Amino acid sequence: MDQAKGYEHVRYTAPDPRDEGLGSINQRFSHDSSTNVNTYVRPPDYGVSTPARPVLNYSIQTGEEFAFEFMRDRVIMKPQFIPNVYGEHSGMPVSVNLSALGMVHPMSESGPNATVLNIEEKRQSFEHERKPPSRIEDKTYHELVQSAPVISSKNDTGQRRHSLVSSRASDSSLNRAKFLCSFGGKVIPRPRDQKLRYVGGETRIIRISKTISFQELMHKMKEIFPEARTIKYQLPGEDLDALVSVSSDEDLQNMMEECIVFGNGGSEKPRMFLFSSSDIEEAQFVMEHAEGDSEVQYVVAVNGMDLSSRRSSLGLSPPGNNLDELLHGNFDRKIDRAATEPAVASLTPLAGNESLPASQTSQPVTGFSTGNEPFSQPYLGQQLQFPGLGNHQIYTSGHMASIGYIDEKRSAPLHVQPQPHYIPYSVNPETPLESLVPHYPQKPEQGFLREEQIFHVQDPETSSKEAKMRRDDSFQKVNDHPISTVESNLSAKEPKMRRESSTPRVNEYPVSSMPSDLIVPDDLPKEEAPIVTQTSSSTPDPSSSTLSEKSLRKSEDHVENNLSAKEPKMRKEHSTTRVNEYSVSSVSSDSMVPDQALKEEAPISMKISNSTPDPKSLVYPEKSLRTSQEKTGAFDTTNEGMKKNQDNQFCLLGGFSVSGHGTSNNSSSNVSNFDQPVTQQRVFHSERTVRDPTETNRLSKSDDSLASQFVMAQTTSDAFLPISESSETSHEANMESQNVHPTAPVIPAPDSIWTAEGSMSQSEKKNVETNTPEHVSQTETSAKAVPQGHNEKGDIVVDINDRFPREFLADILKTKESLNFPGLGPLHADGAGVSLNIQNNDPKTWSYFRNLAQDEFERKDLSLMDQDHPGFPTSMTNTNGVPIDYSYPPLQSEKVASSQIHPQIHFDGNIKPDVSTITIPDLNTVDTQEDYSQSQIKGAESTDATLNAGVPLIDFMAADSGMRSLQVIKNDDLEELKELGSGTFGTVYHGKWRGTDVAIKRIKRSCFIGRSSEQERLTSEFWHEAEILSKLHHPNVMAFYGVVKDGPGGTLATVTEYMVNGSLRHVLLSNRHLDRRKRLIIAMDAAFGMEYLHSKSIVHFDLKCDNLLVNLKDPARPICKVGDFGLSKIKRNTLVTGGVRGTLPWMAPELLSGSSSKVSEKVDVFSFGIVLWEILTGEEPYANMHYGAIIGGIVNNTLRPTVPNYCDPEWRMLMEQCWAPDPFVRPAFPEIARRLRTMSSSAVHTKPHAVNHQIHK
């Protein structure tokens, strides 16, 4: 002890190399009071030489002596180099980062040495790590041995530093393992190569003890990711499909052992993934449906968009496949949350993160959910306080309301404020957030309201004068009919609904629209705009009853949420809504209804006020609809949560979508004051059919009705029309919705609504802007519906979805939408374009399309399925549960309801189709094909009767009186000679039938696979079309002989005319010596055949040389016949052999643009122009071009086949006119046939010269 007190100064002349870096007791301890740092300053060297003596090591704190060898073994040998804290530039090691070892020196916590600690790492370290007994036993020694001296290297300047080390340093580093920890993302396939990738979320490097237990690990993981439910890890070099789950201590031990092996090999670290319960379910769904929506999911995940899938009664469903919407940021996480937060917490401007502590920034709160939030918790009511607007009470009568997350930048604390009758909440920036949100152990289905729930807002204090215009606009006065106001009170006296009945009735009373009193102040911050519903008001001041620029939009979109009923009880069996003894009106304001999907038992309450303003005082701004188009694109949510067989939705009310269950979600959750870019409107059309009142009780599957996307023109005719029952087929380019609605009163006259079948005058077209309508002019002609199948010019109007698979059109439309061709445009006179908001875009460059469509269709070269594909439930059921066939265009008559509604929309994923209703008075439709119509009517009526009787469908179809003209051929009468080819549609054989050469097409059973109702419907379609084909007789149309129904295994087959030389494509490739005259004859025959088909109202849609059959037996007169034009209902399910790539070059721009689902027969004329080029050159168009380039070039009219120099001027002119971008310019087939006949006649008198060239493949 004396030596320790004397501090002898001894110089070591020959220190042991092993001892370098350790030092001895011969160092002076001093305390630097100025810096509060414990330093160890070595005394100067006096050059004293002494004999070798043992090294004595003492503890500075206790003075106890201990063995040097023991200390050497316990101290880490590799110090870290850090800058000299005193500024001296010595290269010696001076300090060890204790925080990296999980330890802190007790004497240096507050000094500069504390800067070595990684504060962030310290904060994120695990505080509950298990302490083994050995570590506790070593505690005394750990306190004793806190430091060791350091000896400099040979180049040491003499300054030496004491290093703070721990006796447990080496043990701590060896007992911990580093992992990459990822959470919050998704494992989904990359669209380009379908390889699994983890995208989105966060990734951190964590360090855990190798001896940690599984329970402790889970606890620590939940500190990082509170929603963690499953832990999986990925070994280096393994793919994401080889993740290993950790669910027990044994699994954890195996993981640690694997990590030790890979950790010693290099810097590559094993990766750990934390998954929540929803992540697992979502990943499984994405994998099952990766083909249809992987790109959208990938883009969402990569960009961190908050677009979580939601549950429906049929399973998880992606909220939307409109990639363009995503790319335009409509579903950006922060923006999306803003749609739900303002109603709850975002009421005052807040700077930075001052609104809430960090611990509260992701606290779930009750609010209006767009369906994208991951949690839902119940509340019954809340009162919102808006600056300058007073209180607005929001009631939710029911079980659950969705909950969104508050963003730290847009939030305010909330507190409870008692109110009578309900459990209200008041937004108050002085109360903590937790007091508002009740916590429940079980969360409901994500993003949806529970049953028996409604939203409404009351504005008791706002006066009607606040509804004055805030902006300068020109106005037009409306008619003098009385207009009543809706008291925006969705509360119901009897909010409960029973599943047994939901029977809304609508009759007797007129409907009108008027403004609301609530106007959001202009000075209210855009992101703080409250989400409220329309408010009640007394009789407005006639001088102040004006509609704001943005108000008409909301009344269009949200009247469905503003109706209240005296008897709101609903039954599931009957789905009509009762609106008796009241006048219903639409309220317009700058407030909005929460976009919630009211589920099956949501009451449709209709509480109507009796105040009636002076109608002459109501003025509508011209630009109100323009604002509607500009603003409603901000948050276009989708509600896939509707359950099967639900029908609580109204039809358009004066151009407004009135929905009992809130499924009309065309931007209905938009925050009106958000300045968001205009979302590309979805392609959405209407086919309106007056229905018999007895048929309005049909149930439906509803997911995403966009009925209110229809724009109502300002009317100058009567505002009140008789109320009638109707049905509407809703068409949408990329989201399915099929919803049969009950009837509702209609405000506008027939000339005030643009119908999909209606036609517009030229003056109307001029008044409709191609991008976003500035205003909607009053209509000048009555917009009566065009007869089904024809427009006013006599052209054939058909549905493209009737002939093309849904995925095929989905891919095309997806590409098209990415090209920024928004929704709908005005209807052309020939029905070629039906649109409300089509944008006139400048042609894009080649590089744009190339980048856009890169790998877009790489894996699409296969048969694709249509919306009516078996297994995809499109048929509905009536009240008796009998499947109803909705395969053909509706047939209308005044007193006979159609039992068929045509599927008009492109379906995607598992979303069910939506058939909505609308009342269109004076709707006259004339069927275009008598035989076709009769067969449909008979088939539909007798189908139901047969199903009820339990008779097999095929037997019934064959025996149907309307199909007696169809020949049923016995399979035993056929003799198969040779297989000609096979594809997804089936196999074609050359055979004999009663001594005649025939082509036998055996249809694969897969074309009819699915549920029994789907098989029945598809089989019904097959028989109907076969019966139509059997009635076609023309020398240039392939003859249809009959149908075989008793083929091998019960398969169906068709027997048609056999053409010796096969397809024209085969002939052009093999026979290079067709002279000009023969080519003209072949083209002329094809034109004759198409003229005949069009005269029978049949559009081919797939006209190309592969589908033109030729017979060259007579060298003087070749024969060409049009084939493969029938059985579209079956054929479209397979899209013939060759898939997508074999169809694109012949498709007209209107088919690819997606601006309309209604096209004319001129699409065949476009295809015929490409056929003329094929006949001329013998080559395939665009053989080496990418799919996306073909689509972009055709749509933008920058791509057509190159016409060779040897082409005759007449041929060239005819070709170019046929493939003209404007359908009006294209000639009809009678004109084409006449010109080809003239050219052929002139060719007889001239020597063939030009076309005898050598054709190159």
From Swiss-Prot:
The keyword Cytoplasm applies. Disruption phenotype: Plants lacking RAF-like kinases exhibit growth and developmental phenotypes such as defects in plant height, rosette area, root growth and germination. Reduced root sensitivity to auxin-mediated growth inhibition and slightly delayed gravitropic response in response to auxin associated with a drastic reduction of auxin-triggered hyperphosphorylated proteins, but no obvious defect in auxin-induced genes transcription. Insensitivity to the promoting effect of auxin on cytoplasmic streaming in root epidermal cells. Residues 457-480, 493-502, 550-576 have a biased composition (Basic and acidic residues). Residues 1-21, 457-629, 761-789 are annotated as: Disordered. The modification Phosphoserine is found at residues 474, 555, 777, 1013. One of its GO terms (biological process) is response to auxin. This is RAF-like serine/threonine-protein kinase 24. The gene is RAF24.
